């Protein structure tokens, strides 16, 4: 009896589908290229030179995912913007240290590769890279039968940027009297989604059908994370920025102290802005304590920037010119030993 000849495809891995995906995304990837990138897709490793304008360049790296926002996107069959979220979570972490993102790589894993879904996701990644001036230089598409439920996939991103050593922003310059400027968020960004999904479950609603402030709730919870790279890089050329905080997991209470030296505190004026409807809806439907809201969500604030009083008007003007919603949200005050470093009142 002759034995059946098995192939990789029989085992659930379709190499032709992977090749079709590469062809489908080539044009999107090409649009993200930078002059420092050497070669194109397909090499074993991606090559990138450091821009010549840097005298003492320091590389800054970051990696992230999008949490369970991905679960919501998959359940709602909305794959076009989750890639933007992936890039945003990485490049926003880099720019808070003054770094210009150089290149990005992604990891896409699934049980059975759906070329159209994967292409939609990677198109979003390319979009995010364009928004941040970052080259998409490669990635890994892993088709792994038996590892994921049908239709599911997972994402991770990795980014490298560069900053002049003398221009690193690390919070060490923060002083009592510094003013805090907020940059508005586009929504929950990519944090707090396990709680968002729980609220939706408890409320018993379909986010695609539920209307909130004239738009489907799905549009509001899946709004792509705002990318602040270009506006912040422009700002730090013209203002003496002492610290920048990216409000991600842990919200106000955990992220702001990461950029503060000892013996100072950030005093936030919560009357300086109004929460977007999606945050009010979440608090009401989930009966969520305000302290928990500030710990879980950005509540409408994507970034907080600390700078001297004399730079405030210049900073606000520049940020608004670059399309940001920016306002004074608080100030830096002296803190005694053991005192909380974030006060919201």
UniProtKB/Swiss-Prot annotation:
UniProt keywords, alphabetically: ATP-binding, Cytoplasm, Ligase, Nucleotide-binding, Purine biosynthesis
Listed GO CC annotations: cytosol
Predominant subcellular localization, coarse grouping: cytoplasm
GO terms under biological process: 'de novo' IMP biosynthetic process; adenine biosynthetic process
E.C. number(s) listed in UniProt: 6.3.3.1
GO molecular function: ATP binding; phosphoribosylamine-glycine ligase activity; phosphoribosylformylglycinamidine cyclo-ligase activity
Record's catalysed reaction(s): 2-formamido-N(1)-(5-O-phospho-beta-D-ribosyl)acetamidine + ATP = 5-amino-1-(5-phospho-beta-D-ribosyl)imidazole + ADP + phosphate + H(+)
Enzyme class: ligase
Entries under SUPFAM superfamilies matching the protein: PurM C-terminal domain-like, PurM N-terminal domain-like
HAMAP family the record matches: AIRS
Family the entry assigns: Belongs to the AIR synthase family.
Protein name, entry field: Phosphoribosylformylglycinamidine cyclo-ligase
Gene name of the record: purM
């Amino acid at each position: 009896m002759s034995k059946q000849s098995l192939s990789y495809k029989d085992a659930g891995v379709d190499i032709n589908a992977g090749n079709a995906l590469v062809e489908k995304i080539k044009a999107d990837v090409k649009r993200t290229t930078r002059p420092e990138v050497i070669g194109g897709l397909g090499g074993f490793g991606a090559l990138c030179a450091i821009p010549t304008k840097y005298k003492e360049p320091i590389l800054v790296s970051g990696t992230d995912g999008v949490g369970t926002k991905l679960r919501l996107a998959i359940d709602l069959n909305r794959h076009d913007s989750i890639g933007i979220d992936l890039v945003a979570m990485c490049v926003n972490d880099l720019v808070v240290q003054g770094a210009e993102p150089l290149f990005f790589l992604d990891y896409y894993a699934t049980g059975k590769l759906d070329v159209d879904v994967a292409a939609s996701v990677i198109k979003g990644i390319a979009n995010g890279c364009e928004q941040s001036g970052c080259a998409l230089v490669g990635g890994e598409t892993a088709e792994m039968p038996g590892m994921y439920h049908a239709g599911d996939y997972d994402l991770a991103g990795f980014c490298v940027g560069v900053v002049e050593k003398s221009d690193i922003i690390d919070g060490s310059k923060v002083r009592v009297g510094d003013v805090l400027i907020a940059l508005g968020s586009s929504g929950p960004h990519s944090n707090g989604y396990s709680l968002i999904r729980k609220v939706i479950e408890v409320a018993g609603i379909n986010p695609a059908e539920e209307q909130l402030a004239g738009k489907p709730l799905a549009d509001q919870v899946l709004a792509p994370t705002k990318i602040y790279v270009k506006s912040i890089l422009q700002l730090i050329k013209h203002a003496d920025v002492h610290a920048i905080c990216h409000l991600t997991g842990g919200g106000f209470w955990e992220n702001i102290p990461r950029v503060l030296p000892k013996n100072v505190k950030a005093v936030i004026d919560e009357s300086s802005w109004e929460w977007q409807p999606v945050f009010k809806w979440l608090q009401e439907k989930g009966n969520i304590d305000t302290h928990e809201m500030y710990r879980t969500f950005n509540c409408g604030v994507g970034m907080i920037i600390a700078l001297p009083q004399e730079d405030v008007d210049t900073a606000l003007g520049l940020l608004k010119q670059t399309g940001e919603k920016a306002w004074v949200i608080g100030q830096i005050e002296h803190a005694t030993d053991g005192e909380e470093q974030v006060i919201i009142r």
